[in-house]
Amino acid sequence: PVHLRLRVPGWAACGHIKGAGADRELTAADAGTYLDILVEDLQNMDVQLNLDMKIRYTVANNMVEETVGQAAIERGPLVYCCESVDTHASTLDDIYLDLNAEFVPVEFEIEGRKMTALETEEYTIDRSEFDRNALYQPLKYHGMSKKHVRLIPYYAWDNRDYGEMRIWFPIAYTV
């Protein structure tokens, strides 16, 4: 007999393990722990560990001042980002994500490599009267509009058109 120890990553809020005498649901309490499975027959061992890759907002400690009021989007172990080519905003600085947004996983291809992108709606600020060359100016708020945006896995960025990339997004808290 052999003890097989499988690590359940900290991001795994739920899942299922089956095989070698184990058959149980995993919960958030299992995240960041090891599962100990006693394997009696190594020749016929078949263990399946399925982890649910839920989409989540991740925030940094407030001591990381550059990210206060912002969040990154993660799915399982993957961090997602946005590139200029995937939005209608004139700059990624104008994008806000809705805390209650619904993300839709879609199959996507970059440079012949298939991956799962996330599609959602973004809030974009109307800055038509904004002087991007002025260091200071009066605040002129003309509202926000919702538009389609695609997020791709961070590992895949910078393989298409030249432009901006962003991981941390300000959050548009709506009531």
Describe every region a protein language model picked out.
Residues 1, 21-25, 113, 117:
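Short, glycine- and charge-enriched coil/turn segments that flank and shape catalytic ligand pockets
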Residues 1-9:
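Surface-exposed beta-strand/loop patches in extracellular or lumenal glycoproteins
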Residues 9, 20-22, 74-76:
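Short strand-coil-strand connectors
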Residues 9-12, 52:
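Proline-anchored loop/turn motifs at beta-strand termini and strand-loop-strand connectors
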Residues 12-38, 57-63:
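Solvent-exposed beta-strand/loop surfaces of large extracellular or lumenal domains
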Residues 41-43:
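Surface-exposed, short loops/turns at beta-strand junctions within beta-sandwich domains
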Residues 50-175:
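C-terminal beta-rich recognition modules with glycine/proline-rich loops and embedded aromatic residues
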